[in-house]
Amino acid sequence: MKPFHLVYYVSMGCPSIEYSLQKAELYLANGVKAIQFDLPSRNPYRENPPIRERMARAWDACSDYEEYFRALSDFRRKHPDFEMQMVSYEDVILTVGTLRYIRFCQENQIKTCRISGSSSFEIARKDMNAAGIDTLTFIDYDMKEEEIAFALETGRAVMLRNKRRGMLSRDGMTEWDERIRFLRDRGIQQPIYATAEMKCGRDILEARQAGADGAFVGSCLMALWEDDQKLVELIHELAEAGERPI
């Protein structure tokens, strides 16, 4: 069985770029092996309210993406051995330019990105793929047919969203095991990552037992950024759940 791929999401720039990277250093010091950083978007429509608020505050504090690139590149030079990922929205890529974004990824050994945007933005993702950068695709809680078809067409790893307030499940499928089984039966063979509302070790175990290949964890940890002791305890709880034999 392949190791469960646990990726920790760090929202950049709130309250400052430096503060976000201090917390990322704490993650690495406590055994984290993969971190996904974002760049603040003016329309982070896929994020939950706390992340939207963080991005808005980060944008107000610093809207110069080159500042983020420089800080992240410095962080990468200090920590060359962890898996570094990125998540960016369409407006971010349009602002910095696809070629500049690709160059940043290549310079920092970033092999995986989540690029959120309209279907017309697919050309940017294909440019990244051609440059050796994998892009994740997204299937929301209601598992729309067009999202499944797109995942089948591209063969990209899937981020499968957990429950979303105000959104109905597809055909009453609410649990990880029935939703992942449904996607596998539809022909999705690529890795499936559980995301959203992953708050504790039990949530990680449920996703693992349902057949998820990995998970993205973010908001539950960022909510503890003012309490390092509780933050470290939760990091270890999540890691243990990701490694425990099942």
Language model features by range: what are they?
Residues 1-80, 148, 152-154, 229:
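Conserved N-terminal beta1-alpha1 strand-loop-helix module at the mouth
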Residues 6-10, 35-37, 84-88, 113-115, ...:
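Hydrophobic faces of well-ordered beta-strands that scaffold small-molecule active sites
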Residues 17-29, 99-100, 143-154, 194, ...:
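Catalytic cores of alpha/beta
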Residues 33-44, 108-121, 159-168, 210-231:
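Glycine-rich phosphate-binding active-site loops on the catalytic face of alpha/beta enzymes
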Residues 46-57, 219-246:
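C-terminal helical cap(s) of enzyme catalytic domains, especially alpha/beta-barrels
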Residues 97-140:
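Hydrophobic, well-structured mid-protein blocks that either form specific transmembrane helices
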Residues 97-102, 172-180, 231-234:
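Charged helix-capping and loop-helix junction motifs
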Residues 148-182, 224:
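Glycine/Thr-rich beta-alpha phosphate-binding loop at enzyme active sites
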